[in-house]
Amino acid sequence: MKLVSIFIGLLLGWVALPSFALAADPITVQEILDEPSRFHLRQVTLQGTVRNVQPLDPYTLPAGTTCYGAYLFYLEDETASINVAAFGLCGIPTVKDPDVEDGARIELHATIQAPSHGGYYLSFQGLKVVGEREGVIQAVADRITPLPE
């Protein structure tokens, strides 16, 4: 009987978990810009329009692995815009166009980076180290989904 209770508890937890994971309502870019430390290293859902897509040259991570197909763009919603980095594929030489184009409406699942404490971020010039005083706020793309027009 105890084993059945444990099994049912695990099953209910497994069934409920995806609903919590999918329940992330989109937030505005301005919410992130207003409180970047609150969102640092958290996953968020944003919706907006793609602007200024910039493919990046291959770059090398500090560990020596080269990454290909990375690009940057701005995601603009009705409140503000935020820099978005798509890291591409590391260790696999490839030539690939960005997954988005200027003017496209998308839903973005991303991890926010606001590394004012130091760290790395991807820029138009490649991988950069953040100084203690820099206020870089960036969304790192986890999943990009086109929105219907």
PLM features: residue spans?
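Positively charged n-region of N-terminal signal peptides that target proteins for export
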Residues: M1-S5
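OB-fold and OB-like single-stranded nucleic-acid-recognition modules
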Residues: A21-E149
